[in-house]
Every structure is written in structure tokens, then in C-alpha cells.
């Protein structure tokens, strides 16, 4: 991972390494119903995070535009969840914006705990990135508009609801934009949500508005499902811009 990050020009100077614990892993299998995850995360280095570790990251959090977390950040252990909540509070006090991806994985924790923790996390975030499937499981809501309303009611100022093949619905609490899906030949959706979140935050950090950033992220995620794996299919900026200006072909993704 360190080698990959460095090759991609990601700053690794504040990465903490735990020599007593393995890196968490997951395995992806595919069948007619899609992709399925198997986890080897118990006792992983990330799961051993403690709130006191934040002293190591305090300056990074304070000087960043965004702190990004997901439901998995909360699910891998109680101490990781506590650390995530403390980091979110620290970011808010430093005027660093907080983004949260619902990323619900019920194989990692019970539904009742997921509901309570994710609800609290939404109250601490500026931008919430749920999926329709996750929110139906968490809240029982099935309609996009109801999920947007619920998310704002919990405290999220901005919400981008991922709708899979139908694209995304972005809301700032005053207006909404529906971003349609792109027509591509989809083979593997592994990592598409992370691709979406990363590109969305990159474009917001570059001062795109919510609508333009969502359109860009939507195109990037569509491109990413055309290959297998979570890293190799990630598109270049040039490929995303080309998709944004090219009529769609194939099937929605």
C-alpha cells in the first residue's frame, strides 16, 4: 500500500505503522448477482486505532480541506469508531469539512449498532454520501427524496445520494440536481463508491460546485466499473473529461 500511494504521489509522511498487527484485507468473488466480499479484518492495524492517536494527525486534520470517513471506519472496531468520532469533532473545530460515505457492511457489525453509529456520524458531517441500498437497510426508506430529507434532518448540509445505474441525486438543502447515469459495459463494481467519493472530494477541493463535482464523480465511477478490481480500472482525468463530453453507449452502470 505504501508503495502504491507513493507512486500515486500521495503524501505518506503521517501514516502510522503497527508492527504488531496485519493490514486488513478483503476478498472479492463474482457471480450472476454481482460482487461479494469476504473480510480478514479482525485485529488489523486499522482496527487498533485509538483516539489518542489523533495527536499524531492533529496538524494534518487542521490543515486539510476535507476529512473523509466511511461506515467501515466506524465498523471495524469500537476503538476505531471512537477515533473516527473524535477526528470528526476535531475537524469541525478546525473548519475542516467532513465527508462520510455510508458504506454499510453488515458482515462487520450488527444492524442496530450500525444504525446508531452512522446516524451520529451523519450529525457530524458536512457532506453525506449514502447509497440507496444502504439507506433502505439503515432507515427503511426506499424513496430518494425521503432519504435526502432524512440526511439533512440529521445535520448533513450537503447530500449526494448514489443511485447506481441511475446516477446520483445531489442536494445542498435548498436545491437538488439529478445527475443521470452513463451507459457503459459494466463488469465489476468493486471500488466504484470509493472512486466516486475520491473524485467528488478532489473536484470540490479544486473549487468545483457540488453539481459539477457530482457530475465528474459520476462519470469517473462509471468508467471504473469497466474493469476488474478496485485500483487498476481507476480512470485518468482525461478519460473522465472525454466521457463527460461523449454520448453514452452500452448499458447503464
Where are these regions (language model features)?
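Conserved phosphate-binding/catalytic region of the ribokinase-like
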Residues: 89-90, 140-253
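Short, hinge-like loop/turn segments at secondary-structure boundaries
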Residues: 3-7, 31-33, 115-118, 146-148, ...
Amino acid at each position: 500500500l505504501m508503495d502504491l500511494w507513493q507512486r500515486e504521489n500521495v503524501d505518506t509522511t503521517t501514516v502510522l505503522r503497527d508492527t504488531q498487527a496485519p493490514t486488513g484485507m478483503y476478498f472479492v468473488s463474482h457471480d450472476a448477482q454481482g460482487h461479494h466480499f469476504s473480510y480478514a479484518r479482525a485485529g488489523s492495524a486499522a482496527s487498533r486505532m485509538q483516539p489518542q492517536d489523533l495527536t499524531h494527525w492533529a496538524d494534518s486534520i487542521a490543515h486539510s480541506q476535507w476529512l473523509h470517513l466511511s461506515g467501515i471506519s466506524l465498523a471495524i472496531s469500537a476503538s476505531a469508531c471512537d477515533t473516527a468520532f473524535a477526528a470528526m469533532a476535531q475537524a469541525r473545530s478546525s473548519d475542516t469539512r467532513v465527508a462520510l460515505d455510508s458504506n454499510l457492511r453488515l458482515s462487520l457489525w450488527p444492524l442496530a449498532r450500525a444504525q446508531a453509529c452512522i446516524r451520529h456520524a451523519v450529525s457530524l458531517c458536512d457532506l453525506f454520501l449514502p447509497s440507496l441500498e444502504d439507506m433502505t437497510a439503515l432507515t427503511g426508506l426506499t424513496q430518494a427524496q425521503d432519504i435526502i430529507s432524512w440526511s439533512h434532518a440529521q445535520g448533513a448540509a450537503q447530500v449526494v445520494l448514489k443511485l447506481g445505474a441511475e446516477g446520483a441525486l445531489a442536494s445542498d438543502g435548498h436545491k437538488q440536481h439529478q445527475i443521470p447515469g452513463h451507459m457503459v459495459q459494466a463488469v465489476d463494481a468493486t471500488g466504484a463508491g470509493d472512486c466516486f467519493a475520491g473524485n467528488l472530494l478532489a473536484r470540490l477541493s479544486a473549487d468545483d460546485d457540488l453539481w459539477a463535482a457530482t457530475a465528474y464523480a459520476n462519470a469517473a465511477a462509471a468508467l471504473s466499473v469497466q474493469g476488474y478490481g478496485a485500483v487498476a480500472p481507476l480512470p485518468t482525468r482525461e478519460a473522465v473529461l472525454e466521457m463527460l463530453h461523449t454520448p453514452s453507449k452500452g448499458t447503464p452502470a
